[in-house]
Swiss-Prot record:
Its EC number is 3.1.21.2. Belongs to the AP endonuclease 2 family. It comes from the Bacteria. Zn(2+) 2 binds at E154, D188, H225, E270. It catalyses: Endonucleolytic cleavage to 5'-phosphooligonucleotide end-products. This is Probable endonuclease 4. The lineage of its organism: Bacteria, Pseudomonadati, Pseudomonadota, Gammaproteobacteria, Vibrionales. It comes from Vibrio parahaemolyticus serotype O3:K6 (strain RIMD 2210633).
Length: 295
């Protein structure tokens, strides 16, 4: 672990890698692109139910992580896209809660302590406040069922009826979660930008993260998704782009790489061209190491 830190500095930078062939393959794929962090799905993200993780797969995952120096703090599992923890219909809500608890249990089996998820949608059937309260209740139920795993709420772009695009939404959910030590936030730069929080310049970043700190609190930031945006500012549309090639530009990502407030948490690429992930990781790391050397 020490060697890894010396080589990579204090930034945990990686990408959302494939778990095809088994979750134990994900850490190997992360290392292939020079990552010291990674995200993965622990099951097929487009299915409600998956077969349980096999003991040999769990052992192989843990062994590969240990061999490559990945600790739980380096890894950000993502739940299924089907789950809506704020679903207004009882049947869909029950199904979503059961699936979310299963995702948490899988994380626990793998020795992982973070679970990243999209908060939920009101589908124009209940108020925003009711939906946010339902999301918080869903988190509380999962916490009571599964120990240790932190529920990491991802901010959204605000497409359709998705909640979580306003920092106030995140704060309102957290306020109603009983175990504050087991809830956090993952800020996606593309979602933040298209939701209406500017990130194009260093000054914009200062303002946006000051607002996040005031409304939610930087101490709740447990991970980030680093994505540029194909679509314009405040468009409420979620379309990722490669770093520096979209509407946000490199200044934002240089800012994050150089700012120590973003040290020690997974910084995960979900950019559109896996062929250049290694290049993107290297550029971010160069920014970070340059900042350290200039201290």
């Amino acid at each position: 672990m020490t060697n890894m830190k010396n080589k990579f500095g204090n930034k945990l930078i990686g990408a959302h890698v494939s778990a095809a062939g088994g979750v134990d393959q994900a850490p190997l794929r992360a290392r292939e692109i020079g990552a010291n962090a990674f995200a993965l799905f622990t099951k097929n993200q487009r299915q409600w139910v998956a077969k349980p993780l096999e003991a040999k797969t769990i052992s192989a995952f843990k062994a590969n992580c240990k061999m490559l120096g990945f600790g739980a703090e380096h890894i950000l599992p993502h739940d299924s896209y089907l789950i809506n923890l704020g679903a207004p219909e009882a049947e869909k809500l029950d199904k979503s809660r059961a699936a979310f608890i299963d995702e948490m249990e899988r994380c626990n089996q793998l020795g992982l302590t973070l679970l990243n998820f999209h908060p939920g949608s009101h589908l124009k059937k209940v108020s925003e406040q009711e939906c946010l309260a339902t999301i918080a209740e869903s988190i509380n139920l999962a916490h009571k069922t599964v120990p240790d795993v932190v529920a990491v709420i991802e901010n959204t772009a605000g497409q359709g009826t998705n909640l979580g695009w306003k920092f106030e939404h995140l704060a309102e959910i957290i306020e109603q979660v009983e175990d504050k030590d087991r809830v956090g936030v993952c800020i996606d730069t593309c979602h933040t930008f298209t939701a209406g929080y500017d990130l194009r310049t260093k000054e914009d970043c200062e303002r946006t993260f000051a607002e996040f700190d005031r409304i939610v609190g930087m101490h709740y930031l447990r991970a980030m998704h680093l994505n540029d945006s194909k679509v314009e500012f405040a468009s409420k549309v979620d379309r990722h782009h490669s770093l520096g090639k979209g509407e946000i530009g490199w200044d934002c990502f240089e800012y994050i790489a150089k700012d120590s407030r973003f040290d020690g948490i997974p910084l995960i690429l979900e950019t559109i061209d896996p062929d250049i992930w290694q290049q993107e990781i290297n550029t971010l790391r160069q920014f970070h190491l340059a900042a350290i050397n200039n201290q």
